[in-house]
Each structure stands twice: as structure tokens, then as C-alpha cells.
């Protein structure tokens, strides 16, 4: 296969190598799936010696196909039969449906194993449409019934998104979209199918709409009831994971958070005046035993969906960019709680920062955050039996760790938003 994958992949939203210089992009394995559809595992190497593997499905056509879209065109290949056009096959509804049929019939093709979960039905005849919502993966929606998520960057080992969704589904927890199937090689997971949450709304969109209403009207939109229900949902998922996979005791991850603080302070010099106090807060917890179990790992308002019936937690892959073994390591459920609390602050203050808000707007944003934090924690406590704020110093440390990460990110990519985590850091260390 002689396609210039490197020229195409660097422009994809899911490409993770933007901070590195690409050296090569070569197919490591190609599996023909029929009807001009090839499955490609692409090895990408960088000039600093780092390597990673991506998954691409290639649809070959004898002529340009405008309906796939310009971004789907990978390149062309010339041979005895003339020029062929290579497209990202997930933009071809027929190719996406071919994948779903392979999963439905639990077939094996070459090194690829497709598996349907027991006692489920896949909508193999439903129309397929690629979703534009995701960044690190690509999803295809089949009617109103199922969603196929194709992992773009693939890593050897057990994928936590499939693993935890399977555990939760088999335990009967209703707070996740039911796992319907998956596909993999002998060494790594490649994709999964879940029930599609039709007529759902993302938590981030709902929260920011509430804040917008608050700033536009004296009464404002109240999100507190939804926050309470979300707290109940998160606690329910935590309880199921703890019951199904067990709990243990570990020390607070002092080395990890201190390493992150050092790296973040280099990226965001604004952190330097606060670094000693942040480090002091972390060191207070050194050797502190905490209860841990498997958790979501990267929970925020963009990872939850509100259906007409309830809240659902999605995307259990863990924190992007972290090694797979770290993403599968048991952690305190307070990490997930801290992620939601940080997300409340972002929902409220991003409109203050981007809209040039005054002190009154900031005060109202703080009031909105406090009200929703109270509601979320009350909902969590109603299921878990204890308010997460009862472990206030540990929860604050996880919030600080998250805010430190956010400060580094904003300093690199979105400097105008840096005041959001800096405001929180100042509050948490005061």
C-alpha cells in the first residue's frame, strides 16, 4: 500500500502527534474486508524516536466520491487498472454497515476478531451516519439504536472503555449505554458498539445553557436538580464497579501529582507563586491510605448524557494521553467527583472570561457553582451513604491536581481561559 498516509493523518482531529515532528507513517498490517474495504494498522514514527499505532479503514473507489467529503480523501494510487481513490471508509455508510454486520455475526477475518455480546440485537439494516462530535475517536450512528466507536490510536492491552462498559452492562447498571459488541486483534481493542442514546443532551451543553440563562435574567436557569440526579448516577456507577471488581487501599499518588505540578509550572509560569502551597497540600497526604477501585478516570460534564429517563456516563477510556496501565489502575472515586466539580467551574466561569464579565457576573457564577456542587454532592451521598466532601482534604487535592493540569493546557492552547483554573487554584490553596 503506497498511500501518503502521513500527509493526511496530520490534519485529522484525532491525531495525537501535533507536538512532535512526523518521521514516517507506514502500514504495519492490512486486512481485506471485502467490497474494496481494507483495515489498516498504521505505525507512526517521530523524529524524537517515539512511535504509536493508528487504525484506519480505507475504502477504495475507481472515481472520486463527493458525498464522502473532501476531508475523507486519503490519497490516490496508480496501477495497471488505472488510478484508484482511497477514502476514510467510516464516511461511507455501506462500509460502516459492513463492520456492523461482521460484529453481528461474530466473524473472524485474518487477525481481526468481531464479537457480538450475548443476547443482544444489532440494527444491521439501520442507516449509518458518521458523527462529527468526537476528537480522539470516530463514531458512526446507526439509526436511533446503536453507535459504533472506532478507536483511532490503538494500544496493546485491555481497553478500559470496553472492559468497564461490559462489567456495568452485565451487572445491570442502567447508568451506561449497553455494550452490544466489539472488535479487536489478539493484542489490542479496535472498536465497540453500544446502544445509542437517542434524544439525549450533553451535560456540558445543559450546564452552560443554564449559566447563560442566569446571566441573561435575574432568576436564571436552575441546573441544581439535574446536578443532584447526576450525583446519584455517578455514585451508582462507582458502587457497581466497586462491587464487581473489588476495592483496595492505596497511598495517595503523591509522586504522580508532584511530577504533574513540576511539568505544569514550566508550561504555565503563572503557577509558580502558588506551587509551594500546592506542594504543601499534596505532601500533607503523603502515605495517607485511601480506598480505591476502578473509576471512570476522566469524568466531566462532556462525558455525561441526559436522556429522557436518566443520566448516562460515557467514554470510560480514562485520561487522554496517559499510558494504558495507568488508565486501568484503581483510583479514588474522589477523582471522578473532582472532575465534575471542576467542570461546574468551567461551565460557569468560561462565560465570564470570554464575555468580559464584571464582578457581578463573577459573583453570580460563584453562586451557580456552589449551588450545583451542593446538589451534586447531596445526590452522590444519597446513594453512596457519605458526602464526598467528608474527605475534604483529599477531594481538594484531586481538584488541585486537575486544576494544575488545566492550567498547563490553557497556557499552551487557550491562554484566554487560563484565569479559570488559576482562580480555582487561588481559592483551593487559600
From Swiss-Prot:
One of its GO terms (biological process) is trehalose biosynthetic process. GO terms for molecular function: ATP binding; kinase activity. Its EC number is 2.7.1.175. It holds the Pfam family Mak_N_cap. Pathway: Glycan biosynthesis; glycogen biosynthesis. InterPro entries: Kinase-like_dom_sf, Mak_N_cap. Keywords: ATP-binding, Carbohydrate metabolism, Glycogen biosynthesis, Glycogen metabolism, Kinase, Nucleotide-binding, Transferase. It is an enzyme of class 2 (transferase). It catalyses: D-maltose + ATP = alpha-maltose 1-phosphate + ADP + H(+). Catalyzes the ATP-dependent phosphorylation of maltose to maltose 1-phosphate. Is involved in a branched alpha-glucan biosynthetic pathway from trehalose, together with TreS, GlgE and GlgB. Belongs to the aminoglycoside phosphotransferase family. Monomer. This is Maltokinase. The gene is mak.
Amino acid at each position: 500500500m503506497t498511500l501518503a498516509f502521513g500527509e493526511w493523518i496530520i490534519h485529522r482531529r484525532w491525531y495525537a502527534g501535533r507536538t512532535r515532528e512526523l518521521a514516517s507513517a507506514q502500514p504495519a498490517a492490512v486486512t481485506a474486508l471485502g467490497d474494496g474495504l481494507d483495515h489498516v494498522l498504521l505505525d507512526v514514527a517521530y523524529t524524537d524516536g517515539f512511535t504509536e499505532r493508528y487504525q484506519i479503514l480505507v475504502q477504495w473507489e475507481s472515481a472520486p466520491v463527493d458525498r464522502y467529503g473532501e476531508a475523507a480523501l486519503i490519497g490516490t494510487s496508480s496501477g495497471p487498472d488505472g488510478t484508484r481513490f482511497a477514502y476514510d471508509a467510516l464516511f461511507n455508510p455501506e462500509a460502516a454497515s459492513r463492520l456492523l454486520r461482521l460484529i453481528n455475526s461474530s466473524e473472524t477475518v485474518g487477525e481481526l476478531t468481531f464479537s457480538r455480546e450475548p443476547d443482544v440485537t444489532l440494527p444491521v439494516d439501520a442507516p449509518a451516519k458518521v458523527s462529527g462530535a468526537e476528537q480522539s475517536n470516530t463514531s458512526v450512528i446507526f439509526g436511533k439504536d446503536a453507535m459504533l466507536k472506532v478507536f483511532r490510536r490503538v494500544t496493546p492491552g485491555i481497553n478500559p472503555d470496553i472492559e468497564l462498559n461490559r462489567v456495568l452492562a452485565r451487572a445491570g447498571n442502567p447508568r451506561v449505554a449497553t455494550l452490544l459488541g466489539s472488535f479487536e486483534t489478539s493484542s489490542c481493542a479496535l472498536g465497540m458498539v453500544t446502544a445509542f442514546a437517542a434524544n439525549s443532551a450533553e451535560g456540558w451543553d445543559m450546564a452552560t445553557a443554564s449559566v447563560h440563562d442566569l446571566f441573561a435574567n435575574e432568576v436564571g436557569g436552575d441546573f441544581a436538580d439535574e446536578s443532584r440526579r447526576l450525583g446519584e448516577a455517578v455514585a451508582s456507577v462507582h458502587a457497581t464497579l466497586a462491587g464487581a471488581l473489588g476495592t483496595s487501599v492505596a497511598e495517595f499518588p503523591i509522586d504522580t501529582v508532584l511530577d504533574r505540578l513540576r511539568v505544569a509550572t514550566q508550561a504555565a509560569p503563572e503557577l509558580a507563586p502558588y506551587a509551594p502551597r500546592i506542594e504543601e497540600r499534596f505532601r500533607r497526604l503523603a502515605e495517607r491510605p485511601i480506598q480505591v477501585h476502578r473509576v471512570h478516570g476522566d469524568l466531566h460534564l462532556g462525558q455525561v448524557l441526559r436522556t429522557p429517563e436518566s443520566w448516562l456516563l460515557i467514554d470510560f477510556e480514562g485520561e487522554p494521553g496517559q499510558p494504558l496501565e495507568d488508565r486501568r489502575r484503581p483510583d479514588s472515586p474522589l477523582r471522578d467527583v473532582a472532575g465534575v466539580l471542576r467542570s461546574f467551574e468551567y461551565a460557569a466561569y468560561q462565560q465570564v472570561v470570554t464575555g468580559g464579565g464584571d464582578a457581578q457576573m463573577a459573583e453570580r457564577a460563584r453562586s451557580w457553582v456552589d449551588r450545583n456542587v451542593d446538589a451534586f454532592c447531596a445526590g452522590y451521598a444519597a446513594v453512596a451513604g457519605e458526602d464526598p466532601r467528608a474527605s475534604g482534604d483529599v477531594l481538594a487535592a484531586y481538584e488541585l491536581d486537575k486544576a494544575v493540569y488545566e492550567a498547563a493546557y490553557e497556557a499552551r492552547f487557550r491562554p484566554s481561559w487560563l484565569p479559570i483554573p488559576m482562580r480555582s487554584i487561588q481559592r483551593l490553596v487559600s
